[in-house]
């Protein structure tokens, strides 16, 4: 019997889920797909400055799982930037945090409603 799915906890969805060259036709060969949980590891580790261990606790998974997700996310990000491909963020094995869970002292739900993932108040540049 297979092991049950362990969902990765994600604080908030990206404000934009598509990035890339403005003049490119986004066919399948010109597109890189990144999952929402891969995006979350990039956000937590590279933007927020968390260690892989801290990221793992926030996402409710093992550090080795975060390491694998992070490696794949960086490969996809590099492929998009270096080869001029559109980066599409969608899907993945995640559940959106309600801000009430164990270890969620950041108030994800309230923060998401007020600021979004960028950490900026709405209308702030």
UniProtKB/Swiss-Prot annotation:
It comes from the Bacteria. SUPFAM superfamilies: Sigma3 and sigma4 domains of RNA polymerase sigma factors. Belongs to the UPF0251 family. This is UPF0251 protein DSY3441. It comes from Desulfitobacterium hafniense (strain Y51).
């Amino acid at each position: 019997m297979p092991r049950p799915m362990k969902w990765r906890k994600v604080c908030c969805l990206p404000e934009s889920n598509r990035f890339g060259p403005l003049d490119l036709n986004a066919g399948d060969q010109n597109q890189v797909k990144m999952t929402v949980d891969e995006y979350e590891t990039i956000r937590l580790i590279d933007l927020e400055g968390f260690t892989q261990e801290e990221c793992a606790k926030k996402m409710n998974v093992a550090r080795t799982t975060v390491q694998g997700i992070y490696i794949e996310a960086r490969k996809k990000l590099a492929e998009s930037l270096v080869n001029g491909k559109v980066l599409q963020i969608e899907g993945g094995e995640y559940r959106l945090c309600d801000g009430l869970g164990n270890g969620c002292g950041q108030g994800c739900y309230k923060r998401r409603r007020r600021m979004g993932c960028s950490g900026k108040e709405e209308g702030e540049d």
